[in-house]
């Protein structure tokens, strides 16, 4: 896979990982402060599945990926900063949920569907009541989601575009529900795909509450592209995990494709998808106020999975 993507000019040498850790350190400290001192309970529960260095990298990637995903949008500086902070927050939330599942924690002991509904009420009294009912690790995770929901409401165009706020809530709820299904039920390719797609789309959707320029067709085109990126990143992640997943007998979407197709067919299929999304990115992106070149983030993120020593 790496050789084919390199041959097509889709893998580039960048110093993305260095930047990820630089921005991730400050984002991680900010997010820890939101949890009110309960974050240590999360790390204790996760054990080796989530270290502080992991969390810094995850927060940094969340910020950088949000910047990449909203690159086609014209977002003023102050609102852009909020969207990037939301990206760091949500990426850490999603990864923490996944890592705690990997550590053997029941999903409802991490964050229940009731907790999702409580956070989305965006009511400080509800927040305080819920936080009194749960142990420290769950309280920390709840506070991150509640802070995300409140910050979404503070974006400049939320009141005028309530349907987009609802799309964000629905995107998260579906991702959370499918994540629970993957724990409680036999592995489902559909549920696996939805969690991959939504984990990326939810980083970029807030940009549409921050940009003054909105059009329904552009909005849908952007969603379609983000969903494509989410599914591609899921496939690249599974490509990197092929050997480990085979050893542990874990489910893997790429291995599922390899069961009925040759290596060459699967590689070319994924490479074609990568090339198409890269082309669509260059066609959509007209703004130059990103912290990093969007093309470098796209390529560097893929590279970070396929050459894990970078991380």
Tell me what each language-model feature is:
Residues 23, 27-69, 80-87, 93, ...:
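All-alpha helical catalytic cores of prenyl diphosphate-utilizing isoprenoid enzymes
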Residues 219-279:
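Active-site/pore-lining binding-face segments in mid-to-C-terminal subdomains
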Residues 68, 99, 103, 238, ...:
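Generic, well-ordered alpha-helical scaffold segments in large soluble proteins
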Residues 261-310:
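C-terminal structured domain segments
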Residues 1-15:
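Extreme N-terminal leader/anchor segments
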Residues 105-109, 244-247, 251, 286-294:
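Structured alpha-helical bundle/scaffold domains in large eukaryotic membrane-trafficking regulators
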Residues 71-77, 90-129, 249-252, 256:
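Aspartate-rich (DDxxD/NDxxD/DxxxD) Mg2+/diphosphate-binding motifs
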Residues 9, 20-22:
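Peripheral, non-catalytic segments of secretory and membrane proteins
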């Amino acid at each position: 896979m790496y050789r084919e993507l390199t041959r097509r000019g889709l893998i580039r040498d960048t110093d993305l990982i260095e930047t990820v850790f630089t921005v991730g350190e400050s984002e991680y400290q900010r997010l820890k402060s939101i949890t009110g001192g309960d974050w240590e309970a999360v790390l204790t529960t996760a054990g080796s599945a989530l270290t502080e260095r992991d969390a810094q990298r995850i927060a940094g990637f969340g910020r950088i990926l949000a910047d990449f995903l909203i690159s086609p949008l014209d977002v003023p500086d102050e609102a852009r900063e909020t969207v990037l902070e939301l990206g760091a927050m949500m990426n850490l939330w999603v990864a923490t949920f996944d890592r705690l599942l990997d550590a053997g924690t029941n999903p409802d002991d991490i964050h229940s569907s009731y907790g999702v509904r409580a956070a989305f009420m965006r009511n400080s009294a509800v927040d305080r009541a819920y936080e009194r009912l749960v142990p420290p690790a769950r309280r920390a995770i709840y506070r991150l989601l509640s802070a995300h929901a409140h910050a979404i409401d503070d974006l400049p165009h939320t009141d005028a575009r309530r349907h987009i706020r609802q799309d964000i809530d629905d995107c998260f709820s579906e991702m959370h529900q499918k994540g629970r299904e993957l724990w409680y039920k036999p592995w489902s390719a559909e549920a696996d795909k939805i969690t991959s797609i939504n984990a990326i789309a939810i980083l970029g959707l807030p940009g549409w509450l921050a940009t003054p320029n909105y059009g329904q067709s552009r909005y849908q085109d952007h969603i379609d592209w983000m969903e494509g990126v989410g599914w591609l990143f899921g496939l690249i992640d599974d490509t990197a995990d092929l050997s480990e997943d085979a050893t542990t007998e874990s489910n893997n979407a790429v291995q599922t494709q390899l069961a009925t197709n040759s290596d060459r067919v699967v590689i070319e299929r994924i490479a074609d998808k990568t090339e198409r999304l890269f082309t669509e990115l260059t066609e959509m992106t007209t703004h130059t106020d990103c912290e990093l070149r969007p093309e470098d983030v796209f390529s560097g993120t893929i590279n970070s999975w396929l050459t894990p020593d970078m991380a």
